[in-house]
Every structure is written in structure tokens, then in C-alpha cells.
């Protein structure tokens, strides 16, 4: 191989290497945050629809029972979520950082959120849905 080809291949490899580092450290965290925000809204909307169809359901929590009901294993066989739209690990919904999504029940409301990039609950990087909590009747 000629010296010019080796130099060109080395330069291309370095460009690809540095581009991937820049992508991983600067762009990918923003992609994770946006994708988690969309996931939280999707799960929240599905819980809202499920709660309107089954107002007697009291506790909706991050468990295999809730996941199964939303995927269509309910008395109406109605699908509220599709498996391709969610992330499940160890029978729990998880965000794009692979941390469990937080379900909080209080006074008949179900609030869901993600701990965000740093994994600490209750600070300013937590990701909440755009809609208010889901009220049970």
C-alpha cells in the first residue's frame, strides 16, 4: 500500500474516532433526556387512558402487573402500550439511563417521573410528564 493510502485511512479513522467521542459526551445525553421525556409522556397517557377505562383500579405502580395490564392483559384485552414503545428491565419500566421510573400514588393521583441524568430524585433535572397527575374516582 502506498504511504498516501495509509495516511488517508489514518486520518479518516481519527476523524471517526473524535466524532464518536464528541457525539457520546455532548449529543447523546440530550438524546437520552428527550427520549425519556417522550417515554414518560407515553406511559402517563397510557395510564390516564387505563384509569379512565378502569376507575376502580386504585394502585398503579411500576410493576409487572401494571405493565401486563397496559400491554393488553386486562378484562377488555385492550392494548394501551406496545412493547416496541417501552423499556422494561427486571419487570419495571425504566428510562433511557436504565433506572426505574418513579410511580407516586397520593390521594388517588398517580404521578410518574424519571430521576433524570444524575439519578437523584427531587432535583431540577427530574423529568415529569407534560400533563397533571392521573386522578382515580
Model-based region annotation:
Residues 41-137:
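Low-complexity, acidic interaction segments enriched in glycine
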Residues 2-38:
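Amphipathic alpha-helical segments typified by the pilin-like N-terminal helix
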Amino acid at each position: 500500500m502506498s504511504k498516501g493510502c495509509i495516511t488517508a485511512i489514518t486520518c479518516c479513522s481519527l476523524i471517526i474516532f473524535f466524532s464518536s467521542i464528541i457525539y457520546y459526551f455532548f449529543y447523546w445525553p440530550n438524546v437520552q433526556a428527550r427520549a425519556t421525556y417522550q417515554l414518560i409522556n407515553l406511559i402517563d397517557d397510557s395510564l390516564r387512558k387505563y384509569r379512565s377505562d378502569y376507575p376502580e383500579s386504585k394502585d398503579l405502580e411500576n410493576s409487572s402487573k401494571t405493565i401486563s395490564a397496559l400491554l393488553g392483559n386486562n378484562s377488555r384485552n385492550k392494548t394501551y402500550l406496545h412493547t416496541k414503545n417501552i423499556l422494561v428491565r427486571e419487570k419495571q419500566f425504566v428510562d433511557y439511563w436504565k433506572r426505574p421510573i418513579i410511580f407516586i400514588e397520593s390521594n388517588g393521583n398517580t404521578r410518574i417521573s424519571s430521576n433524570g441524568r444524575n439519578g437523584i430524585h427531587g432535583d431540577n433535572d427530574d423529568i415529569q410528564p407534560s400533563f397533571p397527575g392521573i386522578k382515580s374516582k
